[in-house]
Amino acid sequence: MKNLISELLLRLAQKEEESKELVAQVEALEIIVTAMLRNMAQNEQQKLIHQVEDALDGVKPDASVPDYDTELLRQYVKKLLRHPRS
């Protein structure tokens, strides 16, 4: 029983570490996108935003991807492009 608990705690710690790494990657990408947008002329920003939104509109998600996940991604991309981090 102790071995099972130890193994479960180890797996939980590994999952937590993986989660921290993913959060760090997302935050780094947010910073990069924000910096890039801020250094672009307004018309270039708008052009990029429209290109990304058009690309998303043209993508059909796999049937195994829940609609909620697809909508969450779309909302997050829109938020990031239209209202970048401060």
From Swiss-Prot:
Its main location: cytoplasm. The keyword Aminoacyl-tRNA synthetase does not apply. Keywords: Coiled coil, Cytoplasm, Stress response. It holds the Pfam family Anti-adapt_IraP. One of its GO terms (cellular component) is cytoplasm. GO terms for biological process: cellular response to starvation. It is found in: Cytoplasm. InterPro entries: SigmaS_Anti-adapt_IraP (IPR019732). Residues 1-36 form a coiled coil. Interacts with RssB. HAMAP family: Anti_adapt_IraP. NCBIfam families: PRK10244.1. Belongs to the IraP family. Inhibits RpoS proteolysis by regulating RssB activity, thereby increasing the stability of the sigma stress factor RpoS especially during phosphate starvation, but also in stationary phase and during nitrogen starvation. Its effect on RpoS stability is due to its interaction with RssB, which probably blocks the interaction of RssB with RpoS, and the consequent delivery of the RssB-RpoS complex to the ClpXP protein degradation pathway. This is Anti-adapter protein IraP. The lineage of its organism: Bacteria, Pseudomonadati, Pseudomonadota, Gammaproteobacteria, Enterobacterales.
